[in-house]
Amino acid sequence: MQRNIIRSTIILAIPVLLLTMGCSKKFEEYSQNKNLPLTVPPGLVLRSILNSLVVFPGDYEDKADQFIASNYTYYGDNKYWTGSAVLDYSALKNVIAMEAEAKKAAGTDKNPYHALGFFLRAYFFVDMTEKVGDLPMSEALKGTANPTPKYDSQKEIFKQSLLWLDSANTMLADFIANGFVEFSGDWYYQETSKFADATGRNALIEWQKVVNSYRLRVLIELSKRADDAADLNIKQQFADIAGNPAKYPIFSSNDDNLQYVYNSTYNYYPDNPNNYGNNAGRLNLGSTLLTTLGQLNDIRAMVLAEPARGLGLADTDYGSFVGAPLGADLSVLSTLSGAGQISLYNYNHFYATYTAEPTLILSYAEVCFCMAEGINRGWTTGDASAWYENGIKAMFGFYGIKDGDNQVVFRNAGGTGSVTYTVHFAFSDYLSQAVVKYKGNINDGLTQILTQKYLAYARNSGLQAYYQWRRTGIPTFSVGSGTGNGGKIPLRFQYPTNESTSNGDNYKAAVKSQYNGQDDINLAMWLIK
């Protein structure tokens, strides 16, 4: 009797199963939108990710770096932040998606997209940890499988990021040597005429340079932990890259710059003819940038700024280039600017066209100054003076400054039309000034390197100039009522508010272990202690 019951159950189940299978198949057929792709080419995802690398000038980063200052309340003040950071985990989700799509297409993880994925993971995690400190990393990006990931220490984030960068270099070197270089979606190198070729080999060579040049930046940013974090091996990693260019190629000229190039069709530089009427009289160059250039008799002052004619000096007198101290009250800056005693943006450079200059993400000049700093600190051998001077000359080249006669253009005193001057600028004269000539591998020499590196960051590279100040105190930043926060410059951002609500226990544990339970913008993270 029992046997018959079982048999009957099986017989009855078969048509039900067949019916269910048939319905499921029809449901899948009807529910699919055949106008939408089931897969996305990895190159298309890469394009989106690469757009996330650039930080456009004119936002809060420019003020945090003290490159620009507002003198008019309606268009914003110069106060530092008081709240939370934006953490770009969405870009990392796209990296994972790109890697998955590339693996589908190639049938293996060994493809150029995966190599670039290593670099991009390091880039975005370092960017985020520098803002707040510890972060979810090893348990992050798992979606509903783990909605409350634990936080990894900042030290572990840097350690893993350096490992990713090493893996990226190794994988890219293998692809370049063995011809597996076909990829798309790289509009920084692959789609520019200088680097374009049929296979993508030239672009991958450039990306290998990006990886190692960026690794130098990361190692330099760890300088305060170089002697007490033995497992990071900071000095030796730096020496390995510096001493073996065949294995670890780095940038060797401005041609290698990782940069965002503007055009006059649809990608406008943020300052352009369209916003001249709103911005031109209400924004000044910051004193930390411009006054320093003027004091160094540096022609970059004339490229970036208009002369402050209220001072009564000649247009091409370096004393005419005075920036706005961001620490001053906004009403003071408004009065100074109205009296022509602080400099406005150079009209010809920023407002006459839609393209101004490319925005640097990582530059040859920065690499030069990183190398000079590493040598100055004794991390590797070499000629710090040569790297230092090459970095300065690279920035002259970036702005189109020639060794000899240069044309500089200013707005006429009446506000209409322009006046052009010929200014002789000899590189050798500039470099031989006592204040510029490298003083050797001592603290004074390091200050010179960091000062020129700050100038090289002008209106590019995101928060790198601020991070340098936070790490070294160089250059001296202007503080006061104008910068807010009780006359102090914050050392970090708070965590996003959704961390305290959606991942509360792990958030509280991280804040307690780092900042004694206070998510305070004025407390130092591990990186800078």
Place the predicted regions along the sequence by residue.
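Short, hydrophobic/amphipathic alpha-helical patches that form generic packing surfaces
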Residues: 44-55, 120, 373, 450-458
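Membrane-proximal, proline-rich intrinsically disordered regions
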Residues: 23-75, 79-82, 86-89, 97, ...
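Structured, solvent-exposed acidic/aromatic patches
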Residues: 66-120, 124-404, 442-444, 452
